[in-house]
């Protein structure tokens, strides 16, 4: 199936040997170390403001920090599932399992559904179908966002990752135990800093409400078809030109290079930026960057088309 990436047909994208050699230059360890430091600092900031909590205004600081932390950890899980995090597969798997456990699910459950997302993007066989965009209307978008906000999608996601026979998941007891141990460790940290109730207020609540809502919003912006293409079914993906705040909260670890990720799924965060450079250097294939997630989301929700954003042919 062809893929439309910005304005690129996937079949037209072929990198030369020289370009691949340039992409593979360097080490992924510095990028991984930097990301690990950012994750640690973000979690440290969450615990600090939890410790200093005196009014609800603090929640306006903690909640964006929590969403950023979840997205950072999710990107670690994401790249580990693609074997694109660090050269050592053993370390990669260990870090990936711990990071996924911090989000309440297993690496195996995520990997199987997400990799089918790359094979069957937004189609009926997309194992990541909770975020898939197949037939979308303004009413449908708003309804699903409300489901995300009230934790309904989180429950469905858990059932999908742990018990979905269609995705052929194999969730072992040891993987579930790691999730339980990791969550108890996070609970212990919050209990030590301020109290166990803040684990539910500043960690669990954003994790099951704000995080899935914003993840849905981002995924919709990354993949929603905004135009009809004659001649068959197409996949869509796009890259975003984000400001610092959006990049920190919604698109950390090169998440915004989503077009390039679908072109080369096993590219590391460091390599995605180089691939983007090669795309922009080709005048015949130069893709268009979307301005921001929030700007595109606003246009999607209020696009004047009788409530129907897109109808695939």
Per-range role (PLM):
Residues 88-90, 179-180, 248-251:
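Short helix-capping and inter-helix turn/linker motifs at the boundaries of alpha-helical repeat units
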Residues 207-209, 224-228, 280:
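Active/binding-pocket-proximal capping segment
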Residues 213-247:
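Membrane-interfacial segments at transmembrane helix termini in multi-pass membrane proteins
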Residues 73-83, 110-122, 218-225, 252-267:
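Histidine-centered catalytic micro-motifs
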Residues 200-220:
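Aromatic-lined glycan-binding groove of carbohydrate-active enzymes
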Residues 84-96:
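Membrane-interface motifs of alpha-helical transmembrane segments
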Residues 81, 172, 242-245:
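Active-site-adjacent structural elements in folded domains
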Residues 1-69, 76, 93, 100-205, ...:
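Non-catalytic, topology-defining segments of multipass membrane proteins
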């Amino acid at each position: 199936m062809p893929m439309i990436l910005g304005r690129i047909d996937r079949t037209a994208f072929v990198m030369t040997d020289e370009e691949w050699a340039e992409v593979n230059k360097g080490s992924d360890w510095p990028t991984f170390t930097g990301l690990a430091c950012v994750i640690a600092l973000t979690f440290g900031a969450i615990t600090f403001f939890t410790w200093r909590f005196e009014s609800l205004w603090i929640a306006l600081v903690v909640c964006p920090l929590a969403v950023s932390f979840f997205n950072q950890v999710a990107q670690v899980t994401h790249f580990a599932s693609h074997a694109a995090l660090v050269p050592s597969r053993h370390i990669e798997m260990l870090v990936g399992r711990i990071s996924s456990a911090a989000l309440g699910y297993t690496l195996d459950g995520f990997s199987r559904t997400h990799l089918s997302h790359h094979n069957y993007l937004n189609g009926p066989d997309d194992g990541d179908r909770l975020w898939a965009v197949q037939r979308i209307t303004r009413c449908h978008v708003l309804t699903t966002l409300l489901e995300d906000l009230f934790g309904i999608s989180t429950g469905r996601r858990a059932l999908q990752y742990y018990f979905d026979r269609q995705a052929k998941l194999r969730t072992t007891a040891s993987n579930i135990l790691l999730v339980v141990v990791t969550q108890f460790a996070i609970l212990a940290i919050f209990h030590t800093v301020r109290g166990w109730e803040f684990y539910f207020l500043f960690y669990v609540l954003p994790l099951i409400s704000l995080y899935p809502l914003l993840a849905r919003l981002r995924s919709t912006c990354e993949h929603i078809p905004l135009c009809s293409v004659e001649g068959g079914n197409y996949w869509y993906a796009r890259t975003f030109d984000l400001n610092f705040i959006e990049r920190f909260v919604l698109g950390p670890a090169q998440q915004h290079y989503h077009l390039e990720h679908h072109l080369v799924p096993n590219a590391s965060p460091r390599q995605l930026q180089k691939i983007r450079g090669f795309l922009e250097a080709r005048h015949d294939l130069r893709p268009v960057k979307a301005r921001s997630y929030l700007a595109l989301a606003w246009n999607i929700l209020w696009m004047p088309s009788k409530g129907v954003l897109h109808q695939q042919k």
